[in-house]
């Protein structure tokens, strides 16, 4: 193979006549085209050689294979030059060479056998695994389906229901469960894996063990009548759960074709569906998200300086409310020692009880053992003073949004914490410069903005000021990785990146409602677009108090472009506060089920009079497409300002922030990726048109106008301000 080859396989033949073929492509032994063609060459060589009796396929350094090399999707989607055909790999290579081999092959699985890796393993005649190895077909997370025979072989090894569940949820299973299902034939410790696989392969050759072709097994398949029921149920669930996604149905169709028309027909159907989905917007969007998520930790001028993260062993949290207890939960789950400080015994006990409840919820769901529960809770210590802060490596302040209180806490922290200690705040809106203005060591101050519930939501917004040391950012990035959060580094401003971008979201909804659009129609359109809930339902969930406080921050910071409405204050006067009072834009029954609030029209009419606006007949019958655009284009506009001001490093970071912080649909690629699919000129012209009709709220910013004139994408680099430090 050439020196530029991306990965390879090596083959060693033992004195027992077993050829060990090892996949080598760090870090996860992904199946690049180079690896696949090298694997084929190794197989063909083993089949030709008279001294080779049997084959074992494995992966280097304790990982079988993490699956098809995702960077190769660009080659397949590009449409330039000669491209490898997935059908050729699935049928001509994996089926007709590997599975049809006249010498038995055994897969020796450790670490990972995911996607294409598991598909190669299933084409072997037996599989031996370690107990903790992860096996699965997660391709649907990328908007495609398994393309190397997975839709045909998995159902024949584990049964239809389990196979569909594994593919549609993309969740891997451990080796032990795989053995109980029949996906693997034996479980052994890592040190015995290769020798066991060698013996197994020879025993197949000697007919002491079955020589199984997975593709032709039928003993695990249900009867045709039962299979049809399973397919119908799976389709109904997929349409309900993923109404905007076609690839879930395509996966079910491929499996069904194999069951009804035979495995060869199923392989052809799988290849046909894979090829079509590969060029879909959904696939391109999800692959963008995949790479964008992995690039958030690359911060120019910070992570390229060669700094090594310092070891953080002990973390203190000030405030044991919902956020503080959630952050404490996330930390102790990752084996950090945590000191939780409160102002009195009552609040402290309540905070500890919340952490305990968070952990017990995991035990109840089967996600945590009682042993792990005891170990985790033992890492938590509750205190009422700062005495235990003298040896902490990091403090996270998580008290209410009160500037003077936070300033006092940071003054105390500077006195009691060691000089190396990071001083972090979980504020969601307050200027960090203001919080730290009373202390001397401002290079240690950083924002660690978690999203509620903090132990579940995947995003960590890391906020840097112009004083924050690069070492402190590197340290917090490392903590974020350790607690399994996706960190996004942003600059310091009102609302930072996520809340700043999305502050027009609810404002646009209220503006439309006051101009005659039915609020429930707005929520339906936005939910249908793919958001977890519409803006009015979201406002009820967070509560009117929080919504009003956040709105006032933005009115203060950006008075020229906020839509000032009395709708929420008027509703608050009559004790409507959202879901917590069972009455807001919706009314809630005792089971928290939402229904329309019959009094809402009255409040909208009052707010309309207060704002001096009237119903626009054009808006009363606004199509769903226009509702989506009038809600989200102002959000895109604000995101452009965030980029122009250097608050975000790159547009892809905003895509991840929107997906993980606000639930923007990942299958649309994130806010900026979606906006670029529509075009900067289109978004600019629509906003310009609306600004003439409905005021400055819709006025497109300079960055957007410039991109529209140039015909450039919003996410293209260049024209950004220097990142705010």
UniProtKB/Swiss-Prot annotation:
It catalyses: a (3S)-3-hydroxyacyl-CoA = a (2E)-enoyl-CoA + H2O; a 4-saturated-(3S)-3-hydroxyacyl-CoA = a (3E)-enoyl-CoA + H2O; a (3Z)-enoyl-CoA = a 4-saturated (2E)-enoyl-CoA; a (3E)-enoyl-CoA = a 4-saturated (2E)-enoyl-CoA. Pathway: Lipid metabolism; fatty acid beta-oxidation. It is found in: Glyoxysome. GO terms for biological process: fatty acid beta-oxidation. One of its GO terms (cellular component) is glyoxysome. It comes from the Eukaryota. The keyword NAD applies. Keywords: Fatty acid metabolism, Glyoxysome, Isomerase, Lipid metabolism, Lyase, Multifunctional enzyme, NAD, Oxidoreductase, Peroxisome. Its EC number is 4.2.1.17, 5.1.2.3, 5.3.3.8, 1.1.1.35. Its main location: other. GO terms for molecular function: 3-hydroxyacyl-CoA dehydratase activity; 3-hydroxyacyl-CoA dehydrogenase activity; 3-hydroxybutyryl-CoA epimerase activity; delta(3)-delta(2)-enoyl-CoA isomerase activity; enoyl-CoA hydratase activity; NAD+ binding. Disulfide bonds: none annotated. PROSITE patterns: 3HCDH, ENOYL_COA_HYDRATASE. Coiled coil: none annotated. The epimerase and isomerase activities are contained in the N-terminal region while the dehydrogenase activity is in the C-terminal region. In the N-terminal section; belongs to the enoyl-CoA hydratase/isomerase family. In the central section; belongs to the 3-hydroxyacyl-CoA dehydrogenase family. This is Glyoxysomal fatty acid beta-oxidation multifunctional protein MFP-a.
